Amino acid sequence: MAKRDYYEVLGVERGAGEAELKKAYRRLAMKYHPDRNPDDKSAEEKFKEVNEAYEVLSDAGKRMAYDQYGHAGVDQSMGGGAGFGAGGANFSDIFGDVFSDFFGAGRAGARGGPQRGSDLRYTLELNLEEAVRGTTVTIRVPTLVHCKTCDGSGAKKGTTPVTCTTCGGIGQVRMQQGFFSVQQTCPRCHGSGKMIADPCPDCHGQGRVEEHKTLSVKVPAGVDSGDRIRLAGEGEAGTLGGPPGDLYVVVSVREHPIFQRDGKHLYCEVPISFADAALGGELEVPTLDGRVKLKIPEGTQTGKLFRLRGKGVAPVRGGAAGDLMCRVVVETPVNLSKRQRELLEEFRGSLQGNSSHSPKASGWFEGMKRFFDDL
């Protein structure tokens, strides 16, 4: 049967570079690898075809001969079955990370020893007051802990793990795959060299069981959404005597009905009456430390910002506290009584012809008049 074009086999253009060839080869080698396709002769043949194509195209000399003469130009240099390992392809370079993903390890001892437990993440919701002042909370976290029945060994009480019969206790097995052989982590003992002949009935040989752990978390003052608190050793238990992982508590601060936070500064809106805005006055505004008095000068407009220094948030890593920025919103009176309406009508009449009472409005009308005059 005629051989397929090597570029077609790898699914690349004839001008493909080294990186593109390598990427295509890795993808196809993973797809057709015999361990992923047991008892599939078609996949095995495609795996060999992919190896052969890459051996030629990854070697500059062989690729040049192939581009000029086709398969005839490289059949002799291939040595009639010298195999993938005899060519220009670098086995460890290409397959080191492939087998690391595929088998869980590609080199001796990669998984043979104790394994650290996985880290855990827990989202902790706080209100603004708790985040600013700091607090201590109790949380319940689902995790994996050492099985107390077998003390984490995975073996039934009174028994011990035995030497793995698949790898003979070395944790690695050598597999012949077509043109080459590969040493991989033992699929039965996962590199430990030991196997559980009589598993623990509680953890089923895993050495760990699911459990909810109750923990006390001290939250420092000044935290904000996205800040993380690390609790060392409070993650999942390790395996084969490995250390536990860590627990990361991620802070999420709920929205506040009054204040908005921006770093160490707080913002709020303060509604004031039309009369207070015009005549000035004094009112109480809320802060996280209680109410404080704010003096409103006469003629205050909507949008005016008043800064209350030091009434913001003290940064979690130290430094001066931020400020509270109060934005004034002048409210228009509604649901007027007859008398109130009469007074406002009288007031409006007194303003006509006197631009000094409304400097912004007067300037706007003057600008509009000039605009239309210029048309």
Curated annotation (Swiss-Prot):
- Gene Ontology biological process terms in this record: chaperone cofactor-dependent protein refolding; DNA replication; protein refolding; response to heat
Q: Gene of origin? A: dnaJ
What's its job?
Answer: Participates actively in the response to hyperosmotic and heat shock by preventing the aggregation of stress-denatured proteins and by disaggregating proteins, also in an autonomous, DnaK-independent fashion. Unfolded proteins bind initially to DnaJ; upon interaction with the DnaJ-bound protein, DnaK hydrolyzes its bound ATP, resulting in the formation of a stable complex. GrpE releases ADP from DnaK; ATP binding to DnaK triggers the release of the substrate protein, thus completing the reaction cycle.
- Can you tell me which residues the record assigns to a coiled coil? none
Q: Which organism is it from?
A: Azotobacter vinelandii (strain DJ / ATCC BAA-1303)
The primary site where this protein sits is cytoplasm
Q: How is this protein organized at the quaternary level?
A: Homodimer.
InterPro entries named among the record's database cross-references: DnaJ (IPR012724), DnaJ_C (IPR002939), DnaJ_domain (IPR001623), DnaJ_domain_CS (IPR018253), HSP40/DnaJ_pept-bd (IPR008971), HSP_DnaJ_Cys-rich_dom (IPR001305), HSP_DnaJ_Cys-rich_dom_sf (IPR036410), J_dom_sf (IPR036869)
This chain belongs to which protein, by name? Chaperone protein DnaJ
